[in-house]
């Protein structure tokens, strides 16, 4: 019976416990070294927002989009070849093989 | 609380039964799938083994593998009314087809005037006249219809301004039989044609009532009197054995890139179909033709585009020397792919490789201005950081020749039926079909053209379904099968599960991969290949001493990896022995000691006055390899190439000539 109880509590509490641990670890790691001693040490970097599941989804939409190296064409139409819905970025077959992000996909 | 207790009780009983009860009692536990609807005729039999529960299923057709070709065959059969099962070790959308992001060729004629006969010529020439012209005729003639059919299924091809499918120039395609300049035949879906193809086919297949058996590892074919009567498979989820009895079996299990140390294929490309056919005593065709790419990232296996060298990147050995200047003084790093691959391999063999094992070379890009690199090759710094862990503006990328595609496979005719060659004639094996990369129809011959393999998948997947619909009718009674059919496979499974030798599976696999990479890769000469054959024999024998650790039967990945290693071994020995025997250079099989093609006539000179060489003395023929699974000994036979197209008036066959681009 104790084995079963351990199993069921483990199964139920596992998900919530993992999130709990993650958030405490995050905040603990982010406190600067002299915090407990209460000295006048200034923070070298500003405190980051704890990445709780809710906080994670609050990231800016534009932030992730600008990191994409291959830009979308306006309306997905390639201005030179007038191809609709084609590959982004420069023409993939310009070197004789099918290139994307420096990788050769087909040759 | 009650629900939780009930759940934990079930959990508890499962835990207990796996540990304490003996194997025999597990036959009484609940099977993981509920038997309902058409699966109602699945019966548990104990004719095979009293240790392993074996479930028997009866279908009209079984398809092994659910990649592009497998899915097309499966729903083609369901559409024709057959009760079809699709047995796959991966979820359909995880098959390796999803990684094929290049385009698909078809002579639709949207960009300029085009004719499928010109596509036929290009493919025959690309295969170095080793492709069977009837199969190539079938594929290129069906290509436009196949692409339009895919588009009707919902595949979102990229479009021109007036709404037709946009085609671009790719893959050695020309107009007017090579005389009319570059042809634009390659259709694509943004950057992910293979991904989109697979998802389209999977979505379409759900309309029909194919029974999917996902995460079932096919062990062997059930052969009786030279006829294929089904497949025996291991359900990975609960460890039960299933026998799928069917009048028609279609093999679409993909290639075997994982026999080499560096390959672009997924870890699951282990040539299971080729091995199943070999164990059934049937031949595999042209396994020595393996397509390599010179610059694949060491360890990761993805390929770096030739554009890097085109923009000024150079290949460096351990001495910091730009070694391509020695091998190709004029073209240097821009020499053709096979020259570059061979030069890299020679440098590595002579000890000038880099890294702790000295088994690769460097591709240097940091001497180029970073803005130029980012402008001309956007995304390369990201690729290099993710896959090689290097900053491309400061360090070189480690590269080595990498396997990309296997042209060889299970020999079939143009209809997709598996054939054997006896007494000078092709004989069809009743009940067995093959398509996709696993099959060898042979459309790619000695070298595959870019964007032709996705076409191969859909055309021959459909061809298998059509042939079965032509020959067979749904609902036919199955011929009787011996009650102990599949016994040997289960015995082998049991042996591997309790294997207690001294070498682990991963060590033997690494030995095999390194041996194949250093002996059967791009650089092939007689001595190197012979040495490789001897080493592969000893690696094969070391399989007797294998050790596995997981003794369970539920989701035993150690066991499945060991079975996959057995399959890889059979493919590897056939590849290297066939390569050693073929004393010529043709397409992807290039030998240093026999640099020319050896055909029945010398096609570089006028044919008049030449004596035709007998079949035994020339090499324009298919290799058929058989293996004795006990000893690993390979026997080779040869089969002539089919030189006539399906309809000589409609499409004239192309007589052989010297291949030059």
UniProtKB/Swiss-Prot annotation, chain B:
Protein name as catalogued: Succinate dehydrogenase [ubiquinone] flavoprotein subunit, mitochondrial
Gene Ontology MF: a single term: succinate dehydrogenase (quinone) activity
Pathway membership: Carbohydrate metabolism; tricarboxylic acid cycle; fumarate from succinate (eukaryal route): step 1/1
Targeting signal (transit peptide) range: 1-39
Function field: Flavoprotein (FP) subunit of succinate dehydrogenase (SDH) that is involved in complex II of the mitochondrial electron transport chain and is responsible for transferring electrons from succinate to ubiquinone (coenzyme Q). SDH also oxidizes malate to the non-canonical enol form of oxaloacetate, enol-oxaloacetate. Enol-oxaloacetate, which is a potent inhibitor of the succinate dehydrogenase activity, is further isomerized into keto-oxaloacetate.
EC number, UniProt record: 1.3.5.1, 1.1.5.-
Binding site for FAD: 66, 69, 88-89, 95, 97, 102, 218, 272, 437, 453-454
Cofactor(s) this protein cannot do without: FAD
One of the protein's GO biological processes: mitochondrial electron transport, succinate to ubiquinone
Active site positions, chain numbering: 337 (proton acceptor)
Membrane topology according to the record: Peripheral membrane protein
Residue positions, PTM Tele-8alpha-FAD histidine: 96
PANTHER family: SUCCINATE DEHYDROGENASE 2 FLAVOPROTEIN SUBUNIT (PTHR11632), SUCCINATE DEHYDROGENASE [UBIQUINONE] FLAVOPROTEIN SUBUNIT, MITOCHONDRIAL (PTHR11632:SF51)
Localization (cell): Mitochondrion inner membrane
Keywords from the UniProt entry: Electron transport, FAD, Flavoprotein, Membrane, Mitochondrion, Mitochondrion inner membrane, Oxidoreductase, Transit peptide, Transport, Tricarboxylic acid cycle
Ligand binding (oxaloacetate): 293, 337, 404, 448, 451
Similarity-based family: Belongs to the FAD-dependent oxidoreductase 2 family. FRD/SDH subfamily.
Organism expressing this protein natively: Danio rerio (Zebrafish)
Cellular component aspect of the GO annotation: mitochondrial inner membrane; respiratory chain complex II (succinate dehydrogenase)
Subunit-structure text: Component of complex II composed of four subunits: a flavoprotein (FP), an iron-sulfur protein (IP), and a cytochrome b composed of a large and a small subunit.
Regulation: Enol-oxaloacetate inhibits the succinate dehydrogenase activity.
Reaction(s) catalysed (UniProt annotation): a ubiquinone + succinate = a ubiquinol + fumarate; (R)-malate + a quinone = enol-oxaloacetate + a quinol; (S)-malate + a quinone = enol-oxaloacetate + a quinol
Gene symbol of the encoding locus: sdha
Pfam families in the cross-refs: FAD_binding_2 (PF00890), Succ_DH_flav_C (PF02910)
InterPro entries reported in the protein's UniProt record: FAD-dep_OxRdtase_2_FAD-bd (IPR003953), FAD/NAD-bd_sf (IPR036188), FRD_SDH_FAD_BS (IPR003952), Fum_R/Succ_DH_flav-like_C_sf (IPR037099), Fum_Rdtase/Succ_DH_flav-like_C (IPR015939), SdhA/FrdA/AprA (IPR030664), Succ_DH/fumarate_Rdtase_cat_sf (IPR027477), Succ_DH_flav_su_fwd (IPR011281)
């Amino acid at each position: 019976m104790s084995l079963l109880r351990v199993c069921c509590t483990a199964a139920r509490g596992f998900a919530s416990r993992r999130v709990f641990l993650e958030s405490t670890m995050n905040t603990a790691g982010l406190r600067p070294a002299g915090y407990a001693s209460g000295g006048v040490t200034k923070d070298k970097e500003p405190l980051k927002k704890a990445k709780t599941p809710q906080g994670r989804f609050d990231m800016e939409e534009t932030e992730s989009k600008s990191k994409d190296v291959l830009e979308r064409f306006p309306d997905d139409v390639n201005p030179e070849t007038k191809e609709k819905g084609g590959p982004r970025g420069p023409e993939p077959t310009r070197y004789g093989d099918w290139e994307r992000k420096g990788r050769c996909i087909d040759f | 609380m009650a629900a939780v207790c009930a759940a934990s009780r079930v959990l508890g009983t499962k835990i207990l039964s796996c540990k304490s009860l003996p194997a025999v009692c597990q036959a009484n536990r609940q099977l993981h799938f509920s038997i309902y609807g058409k699966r109602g005729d699945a019966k548990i039999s104990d004719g095979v083994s009293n240790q392993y529960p074996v479930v028997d299923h009866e279908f009209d057709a079984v398809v092994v593998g659910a990649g592009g070709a497998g899915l097309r065959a499966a729903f083609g059969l369901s559409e024709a009314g057959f009760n079809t099962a699709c047995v796959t070790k991966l979820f359909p959308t995880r098959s390796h087809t999803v990684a094929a992001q290049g385009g698909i060729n078809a002579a639709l004629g949207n960009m300029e005037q085009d004719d499928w006969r010109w596509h036929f010529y290009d493919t025959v020439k690309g295969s170095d006249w080793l492709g069977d012209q009837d199969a190539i005729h079938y594929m290129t003639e069906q290509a436009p219809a196949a692409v339009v059919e895919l588009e009707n299924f919902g595949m979102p091809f990229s479009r021109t301004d007036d709404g037709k499918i946009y085609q671009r120039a790719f893959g050695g395609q020309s107009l007017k039989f090579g005389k009319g300049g570059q042809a634009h035949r390659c259709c694509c879906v943004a950057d992910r044609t293979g991904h989109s193809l697979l998802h389209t086919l999977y979505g379409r297949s759900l309309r029909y009532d194919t029974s999917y058996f996902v995460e079932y590892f096919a062990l062997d074919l059930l052969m009786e009197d030279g006829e294929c009567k089904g497949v025996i498979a291991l359900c990975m989820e609960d460890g039960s054995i299933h026998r799928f009895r069917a009048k028609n079996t279609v093999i679409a299990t993909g290639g075997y890139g994982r026999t080499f140390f560096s390959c672009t294929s997924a870890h699951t490309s282990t040539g299971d179909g080729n091995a199943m056919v070999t164990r059934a005593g049937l031949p595999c065709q042209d396994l020595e033709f393996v397509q390599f790419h010179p610059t694949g990232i060491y360890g990761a296996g993805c390929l770096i585009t030739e554009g890097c060298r085109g923009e000024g990147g150079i290949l460096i050995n351990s001495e910091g020397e730009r070694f391509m200047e020695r091998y190709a003084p004029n073209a240097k790093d821009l020499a053709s792919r096979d020259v570059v691959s061979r030069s890299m391999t020679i440098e590595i063999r002579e000890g000038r490789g880099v890294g702790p094992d000295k088994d690769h070379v460097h591709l240097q890009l940091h001497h180029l201005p970073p803005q130029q690199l980012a402008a001309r090759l956007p995304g390369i710094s990201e690729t290099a950081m993710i896959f090689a862990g290097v900053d491309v503006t400061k360090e070189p990328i480690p590269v080595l020749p990498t396997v990309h595609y296997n042209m060889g496979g299970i020999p079939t005719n143009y209809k997709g039926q598996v054939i054997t060659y006896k007494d000078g004639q092709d004989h069809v094996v009743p009940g067995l079909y093959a398509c996709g990369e696993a099959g060898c129809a042979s459309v790619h011959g000695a070298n595959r053209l870019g964007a032709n393999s996705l076409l191969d998948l859909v055309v021959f997947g459909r061809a298998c379904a059509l042939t079965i619909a032509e020959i067979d009718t749904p609902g036919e009674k199955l011929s009787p099968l011996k009650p102990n059919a599949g016994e040997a496979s289960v015995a082998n499974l049991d042996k591997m599960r309790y294997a207690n030798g001294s070498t682990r599976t991963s060590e033997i696999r690494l030995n095999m991969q390194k041996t194949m990479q250093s002996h059967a890769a791009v650089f092939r000469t007689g001595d190197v290949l012979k040495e490789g054959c001897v080493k592969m024999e000893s690696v094969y024998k070391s399989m007797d001493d294998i050790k596995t650790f997981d003794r369970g039967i539920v989701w035993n990945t150690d066991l499945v990896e060991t079975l996959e290693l057995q399959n890889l071994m059979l493919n590897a020995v056939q590849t290297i022995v066939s390569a050693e025997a073929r004393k010529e250079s043709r397409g992807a099989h290039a030998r240093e000691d026999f640099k020319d093609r050896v055909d029945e006539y010398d096609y570089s000179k006028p044919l008049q006055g030449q004596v035709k060489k007998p079949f035994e003395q020339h090499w324009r023929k298919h290799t058929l390899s058989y293996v004795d699974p006990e000893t690993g000994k390979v026997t080779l036979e040869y089969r002539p190439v089919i030189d006539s197209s399906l309809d000589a008036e409609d499409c004239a066959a192309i007589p052989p000539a010297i291949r030059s681009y």
